[in-house]
């Protein structure tokens, strides 16, 4: 998505700060220290947050993170970004192969949409990918969580229009305006 935006003319540097198996609570603990090093010195910034799937995975018969803690963690990140003048965008957890995880991720996604709505933060729901045959086949053919290229292209198709609108409205002018 960032590469496509650069190709469309946005002068953009993207930092992926994901850590495998990190939950929203883990991200909330470390996000500020990691982003403050990168987002400074007068440029325009934005924070894209995509968490939640690791929260809904069962461990010992329970989700790794309760929905309430997940929502509080995301709210804390969004409030911290807002306090620093950094616009935020949230991408909901995508569906996987496990039906229980799909249902829990969809419920969490609805909660995340609410957290974002209260803060006027754009939110991208990815739950519709559960009905996308390409996404479903690619996730099933892999590790049950991650698709390959065609699946990620489906995810990007959901995120990209919202991301570009967010860039233009909140982060930086569109290439045509600069």
Mark where each language-model region is:
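Conserved SGNH/GDSL esterase-like catalytic core that processes O-acyl groups on lipids
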Residues: 1-72
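A generic structural signal for well-ordered alpha-helical segments
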Residues: 5, 81, 115-116
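Generic structural signal for well-ordered alpha-helical scaffold segments
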Residues: 32-36, 78-79, 160, 164
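Surface-exposed alpha-helical segments enriched in charged/polar residues
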Residues: 36, 75-79, 110-114
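Active-site segments of SGNH/GDSL-like serine hydrolases
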Residues: 50-57, 78-108
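Catalytic His-Asp segment of secreted/periplasmic serine-dependent ester chemistry enzymes
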Residues: 94-178
